[in-house]
Amino acid sequence: MEIVLNGAPRVLPPGQTLNELVVALQLEGQALALAVNRSVVPRQRWDDVALQAQDRVDIVRAIGGG
């Protein structure tokens, strides 16, 4: 299935969860915020949210600085 990830098309296995996407992108353990179709999804729900074709997923990484 195809989703839009940070504005770019990306093909994923059907039913992939947000957490599985984070692992596939090798981003686990990082400070991230995820939104699906402009709705922020709390980290504790990432295993429960299965992505659907044409979902728009935005991943934002927190970067410390001064």
Predicted segments with their positions:
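Ubiquitin-like/PB1-type beta-grasp interaction modules and other compact soluble beta-rich domains
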Residues: M1-G65
